[in-house]
């Protein structure tokens, strides 16, 4: 397995990965349509995405996992944290250390940027909960809320 930075040239592989996710589990809440693809491509040319860290795990030339985080500076306490936006491994590659390897590499990249804390909203399914409990040096707090801005 190798882990690389997600760049624009990997978009076709990422789309294949997302299709495989849906083939293996029907739990994903958005469609891979033209609008979605257009938004993903545009994100690589939008300065608002400059402080993101996105990594891909490849096995046998196919993406089997992905992790995405963004940097969150806060004047509340003068800290800079990272928000774990997404971590996912295709079902057929789970329980093989892919998610832990992605998280470890993300932590290395964030440490290079002087960031020492990752915050995340957590999925409630049992498999995800087992993963979260396996993360060393972590504490669980509160729950999450999504607020739509209309």
Residue ranges and their predicted role:
Residues 56, 62-71, 83, 88:
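Conserved beta-strand in the GNAT
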Residues 22-42:
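Conserved GNAT-fold acetyl-CoA-binding loop/helix
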Residues 89, 95-108, 134:
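Conserved acetyl-CoA-binding loop-helix of GNAT-fold acetyltransferases
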Residues 72-84, 94, 140-141:
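A conserved beta-turn-beta hairpin within the catalytic core of GNAT-like acetyltransferases
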Residues 72, 90, 123:
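Residue-level recognition of the GNAT/N-acetyltransferase active site
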Residues 42-56, 83:
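A short helix-loop-beta-strand connector motif used in the catalytic cores of GNAT acetyltransferases and
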Residues 100, 116, 123-149:
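Conserved active-site alpha-helix within GNAT-family acetyltransferase domains
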Residues 2-16, 27:
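A short beta-loop-alpha structural element at the N-terminal edge
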